[in-house]
Amino acid sequence: MEDGKKAASMSAEKQKALAAALAQIEKQFGKGSIMKMGDAEVEPVQVVSTGSLGLDVALGVGGLPRGRVVEIYGPESSGKTTLTLQVVAEMQKLGGTCAFIDAEHALDVTYADKLGVKVPDLLISQPDTGEQALEIADALVRSGSVDLIVIDSVAALVPKAEIEGEMGDALPGLQARLMSQALRKLTGTIKRTNCLVIFINQIRMKIGVMFGSPETTTGGNALKFYASVRLDIRRIGSIKKGDEVVGNETKVKVVKNKVAPPFREAIFDILYGAGVSREGEIIDLGVEAKVVEKSGAWYSYNGERIGQGRDNCREFLRENAELAREIENKVREHLGVTPMGAVTLAEEVEED
């Protein structure tokens, strides 16, 4: 009996001490700096579409998560910048503000416009050094008014000491230290301001690797740890119209995912000058989900024929955007992914 009273008394003292500690923390760091998980509802992850229906499904939550760091890497001409510009276009459709930090000094504004990016509204910076690029990113994140920042690319974030030094100077680990410091500084602010930051990265080969993949990404290991999502993008084939190559068949693997199960893959077409062939994906996934019926070469929707052959069907959906959106939303519902255009950023602000 006495033991029970003693235990209850100790438990009450512990609760009292915990309440005092929580009050002190809230007084020092502000309300909401610490809370019990049961006190607040777990909010669903806010996402922005990648512009590819298949990749949105592979990501498990319907797109790239906001308030997180994302890394997109792959070989040259695999579609890294194209995919990222599609994300920019999707964020702008929701009414978001986007910034593109072009460390490679290679952004093709005309191509971005063709992919649906509202170029006059896009914030563009072409910094001289890696430090300058990351300081600009930090300032934009801290402002709380930017919804998406793209840094193209990590390999081009050259430290100031390297630019000011001589050719051939050995400066080991300088870029890795720069990235590590920047990510330590950025991560907390990115979460608070709900800004999505995408780092585009290149592939390098490790020398003397006997077992496992010799491939690695630039900028050290920090980005691998801080990124919530890592996408490996590869070109796996060409799309031809007669003898002319009109696009690439692309495969994206979700190498890391902190918001849904990883290691899923998506295969889609990237057409030159047009970007990801959304209509092609709607047809393929629509047939899989039995939303679109396929009989021989003919494709039908709700009992009505929409085209003979995949190319004709794709062209029909491109010309009938409302029908394409209707089919896409049915496919998304079937696959358990958020419907397109469900909530815009303006509506989110009004709700708050």
UniProtKB/Swiss-Prot annotation:
<dbReference type="InterPro" id="IPR003593">
    <property type="entry name" value="AAA+_ATPase"/>
</dbReference>
<dbReference type="GO" id="GO:0003684">
    <property type="term" value="F:damaged DNA binding"/>
</dbReference>
<keyword id="KW-0238">DNA-binding</keyword>
<dbReference type="InterPro" id="IPR023400">
    <property type="entry name" value="RecA_C_sf"/>
</dbReference>
<dbReference type="GO" id="GO:0006310">
    <property type="term" value="P:DNA recombination"/>
</dbReference>
<protein>
    <recommendedName>
        <fullName>Protein RecA</fullName>
    </recommendedName>
</protein>
<dbReference type="Pfam" id="PF21096">
    <property type="entry name" value="RecA_C"/>
</dbReference>
<keyword id="KW-0234">DNA repair</keyword>
<dbReference type="GO" id="GO:0003697">
    <property type="term" value="F:single-stranded DNA binding"/>
</dbReference>
<dbReference type="GO" id="GO:0005524">
    <property type="term" value="F:ATP binding"/>
</dbReference>
<feature type="binding site">
    <location>
        <begin position="74"/>
        <end position="81"/>
    </location>
    <ligand>
        <name>ATP</name>
    </ligand>
</feature>
<dbReference type="Pfam" id="PF00154">
    <property type="entry name" value="RecA"/>
</dbReference>
<dbReference type="GO" id="GO:0016887">
    <property type="term" value="F:ATP hydrolysis activity"/>
</dbReference>
<keyword id="KW-0067">ATP-binding</keyword>
<keyword id="KW-0233">DNA recombination</keyword>
<keyword id="KW-0742">SOS response</keyword>
<dbReference type="InterPro" id="IPR020587">
    <property type="entry name" value="RecA_monomer-monomer_interface"/>
</dbReference>
<comment type="similarity">
    <text>Belongs to the RecA family.</text>
</comment>
<comment type="function">
    <text>Can catalyze the hydrolysis of ATP in the presence of single-stranded DNA, the ATP-dependent uptake of single-stranded DNA by duplex DNA, and the ATP-dependent hybridization of homologous single-stranded DNAs. It interacts with LexA causing its activation and leading to its autocatalytic cleavage.</text>
</comment>
<dbReference type="GO" id="GO:0140664">
    <property type="term" value="F:ATP-dependent DNA damage sensor activity"/>
</dbReference>
<keyword id="KW-0963">Cytoplasm</keyword>
<dbReference type="GO" id="GO:0009432">
    <property type="term" value="P:SOS response"/>
</dbReference>
<dbReference type="InterPro" id="IPR027417">
    <property type="entry name" value="P-loop_NTPase"/>
</dbReference>
<dbReference type="GO" id="GO:0006281">
    <property type="term" value="P:DNA repair"/>
</dbReference>
<keyword id="KW-0227">DNA damage</keyword>
<dbReference type="InterPro" id="IPR049428">
    <property type="entry name" value="RecA-like_N"/>
</dbReference>
<dbReference type="GO" id="GO:0005829">
    <property type="term" value="C:cytosol"/>
</dbReference>
<keyword id="KW-0547">Nucleotide-binding</keyword>
<dbReference type="InterPro" id="IPR020584">
    <property type="entry name" value="DNA_recomb/repair_RecA_CS"/>
</dbReference>
<dbReference type="InterPro" id="IPR049261">
    <property type="entry name" value="RecA-like_C"/>
</dbReference>
<dbReference type="InterPro" id="IPR020588">
    <property type="entry name" value="RecA_ATP-bd"/>
</dbReference>
<dbReference type="InterPro" id="IPR013765">
    <property type="entry name" value="DNA_recomb/repair_RecA"/>
</dbReference>
